[in-house]
């Protein structure tokens, strides 16, 4: 950061992101007194932003909670092993680096040229969940932001024929962990600008050589085009995800259509 204008911009943006982070945490009761929160730190802009917001909140919150930053070193070629330890030591943050060679497994299983992201993410999630349980972590914090949630909604809608996105808070399927997404109200534009102003030591996400998920790229481009024509489009879509009318959908599990009968008519 080189001038006062940048410092003022950073201060304003930081307050804005922290306000949104605090808002979603309060609305969904994400953090409780005595929590041990594991921040999954990949070295990307979003996870750095997440860690920074939780550290700021930790200083101001009326409750007490622990933070531990955890990175999974998957032994991808060219991964800069020293970057995260050096950064976290300088910040005085408790951290742990898990070393697992999932890269070799993924390369062996997935044919050349195919995206490895699906298998890689499933393996990563399992390893992180195991670590959380073994270390008495009460909340696993992920860096997904508003745009990730919207994109996932459209991916499921267009390609899976289902209406679902990413919840802000969930109990894992095996009921071993609670996952929270404190950046759910924050846009990708905000995390990108914040990471640039803070000059985080970003680690590229494509060290494995995997191609981008073309479906997600298509959805992201579509949403960005919509946003150009209507700057509030993403906000409106995001609002819709918490404004659902089950009786106006077709899912019999969500609304009892079957038992609506002529006896219910009131005239």
From Swiss-Prot:
InterPro entries reported in the protein's UniProt record: Rossmann-like_a/b/a_fold (IPR014729), TilS/TtcA_N (IPR011063), tRNA_Cyd_32_2_STrfase (IPR012089), tRNA_thiolation_TtcA_Ctu1 (IPR035107)
Cellular compartment(s): Cytoplasm
The record's free-text note on cofactor binding: Binds 1 [4Fe-4S] cluster per subunit. The cluster is chelated by three Cys residues, the fourth Fe has a free coordination site that may bind a sulfur atom transferred from the persulfide of IscS.
GO cellular component terms given for this protein: cytoplasm
Reactions it catalyzes: cytidine(32) in tRNA + S-sulfanyl-L-cysteinyl-[cysteine desulfurase] + AH2 + ATP = 2-thiocytidine(32) in tRNA + L-cysteinyl-[cysteine desulfurase] + A + AMP + diphosphate + H(+)
GO molecular function, one term: ATP binding
GO terms (BP aspect): tRNA thio-modification
Necessary cofactors: Mg(2+); [4Fe-4S] cluster
Root EC class: transferase
SUPFAM superfamilies given in the database record: Adenine nucleotide alpha hydrolases-like
Pathway this chain belongs to: tRNA modification
Keyword set includes Kinase: no
Function: Catalyzes the ATP-dependent 2-thiolation of cytidine in position 32 of tRNA, to form 2-thiocytidine (s(2)C32). The sulfur atoms are provided by the cysteine/cysteine desulfurase (IscS) system.
Further comment: The thiolation reaction likely consists of two steps: a first activation step by ATP to form an adenylated intermediate of the target base of tRNA, and a second nucleophilic substitution step of the sulfur (S) atom supplied by the hydrosulfide attached to the Fe-S cluster.
Subunit structure and binding partners: Homodimer.
Protein name, as recorded: tRNA-cytidine(32) 2-sulfurtransferase 2
Organism this protein belongs to: Francisella tularensis subsp. holarctica (strain LVS)
């Amino acid at each position: 950061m080189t001038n006062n204008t940048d410092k003022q911009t950073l201060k304003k943006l930081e307050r804005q992101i922290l306000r949104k982070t605090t808002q979603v945490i309060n609305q969904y009761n994400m953090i409780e007194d005595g929590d041990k929160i594991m921040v999954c730190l990949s070295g990307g802009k979003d996870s750095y932003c997440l860690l920074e917001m939780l550290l700021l909140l930790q200083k101001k919150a009326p409750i007490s909670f622990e933070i531990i930053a955890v990175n999974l070193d998957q032994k991808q070629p060219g991964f800069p092993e020293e970057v995260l330890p050096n950064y976290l030591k300088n910040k005085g943050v408790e951290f742990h680096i898990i070393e697992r060679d999932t890269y070799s497994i993924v390369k062996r299983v997935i044919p050349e040229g195919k995206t490895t992201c699906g298998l890689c993410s499933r393996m990563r999630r399992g390893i992180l969940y195991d670590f959380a349980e073994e270390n008495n972590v009460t909340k696993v914090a992920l860096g997904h932001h508003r745009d990730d949630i919207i994109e996932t909604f459209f991916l499921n809608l267009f390609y899976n024929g289902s209406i679902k996105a990413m919840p802000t808070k969930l109990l894992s399927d095996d009921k071993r962990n609670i996952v929270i997404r404190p950046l759910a109200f924050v846009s990708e534009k905000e995390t990108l600008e914040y990471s640039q102003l803070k000059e985080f030591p970003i680690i590229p996400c494509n060290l494995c050589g995997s191609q981008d998920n073309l479906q997600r790229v298509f959805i992201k481009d579509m949403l960005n085009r919509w946003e150009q024509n209507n700057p509030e489009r993403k906000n409106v879509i995001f609002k819709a995800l918490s404004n659902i009318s089950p009786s106006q959908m077709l899912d019999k599990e969500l609304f009892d259509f079957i038992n609506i009968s002529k006896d219910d008519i009131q005239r």
